[in-house]
Amino acid sequence: MCISRIAFGKVFKKSDSPFKDNRFSEKILGPDFAFLLKAHGEAMPYFKSLKREIISVATFDGLKLDGLFVACPQTSSDTVILVHGYNSSPEGDFPVITRYYLENGFNVLCTNNRGGKNGDGDDITFGIFERLDTALWVDEIAKRHPDGNIVLHGVSLGGATVCMMSELTLKNVCAVISDCAYTSVRDEFDYTTKFVAGFTPRRSLEKMYRIFEKTHGLSVDEFTPLKAVANAKYPILFIHGKEDRFIPVSMAYELFDACPAKKELYIVEGAGHAASCVRNPAEYASRTLEFIKGCKR
């Protein structure tokens, strides 16, 4: 149980990013990791120069989460909510994406998720509670722009989160963009442990899941992206890098096949994990914007 508890603390709690070790990053995220860091680094001065407004929400369990709202240079009532990945932040995932949305008529709200680098709280629930947190921001934006469209765009854990939100009834949401989402926590950990260690330590994982259930009062299997998209209420664009080593591209096909709503699948040739937006940025922008255009209310 001791090993499982340590693993629980490493995986489901806020911690320093494991991707600081470049050798580990190259193995699990692929050679695109350095390319991704470079692209975001080049876009960072622009991102930091943006005038932001903090929009805070209070979660059901007492956390205060801050979102960074950036108004479109041209007056707009349409907003994209960007949901970052595991142990990350808006600065870590969205310097590139933010710009093309702002330049194409959208306000942008970047969330700081629970357990993320800048987020309140220490617990990471892989979309289970994050979906409810993000729904609070949806409500805030809908109050500000009651006639506007809201797009949910998430990357990695954020992609899984917006998939899990697709079955919720949400004000003004017209489309979901899911970039490199996993099908479930269980599927992802089975895959990742085998890829990294060469085998899947099922007994240890099961003990870790039991600790999660005891801590949070629900199972990791109760809410999953795969289950949620099967009841999707909104159009979904599924994006995935073909060379993703962290979350396999096969999961994008599973999510796509399970979704009964309007949908598209965009597989980015040569892209590693979370790197689709920088591997072919012009095509990524055009595909997402065209999809959203066809979904506006």
Please annotate each region the language model reported.
Residues 100-120:
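Conserved alpha/beta-hydrolase
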Residues 271-282:
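Catalytic histidine-centered segment of alpha/beta-hydrolase-like enzymes
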Residues 164-218, 267:
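Hydrolase active-site cap/lid region
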Residues 231-233, 238-240, 244:
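Short beta-strand/loop motif that positions the catalytic acidic residue
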Residues 234, 248-257:
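Short alpha-helix in the alpha/beta-hydrolase fold that links the catalytic acid
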Residues 1-58:
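An N-terminal hydrophobic leader/cap segment in hydrolases
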Residues 86-100, 113:
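The serine-hydrolase catalytic nucleophile loop
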Residues 90, 114-145, 149:
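Catalytic nucleophile-loop/oxyanion-hole region of alpha/beta-hydrolase
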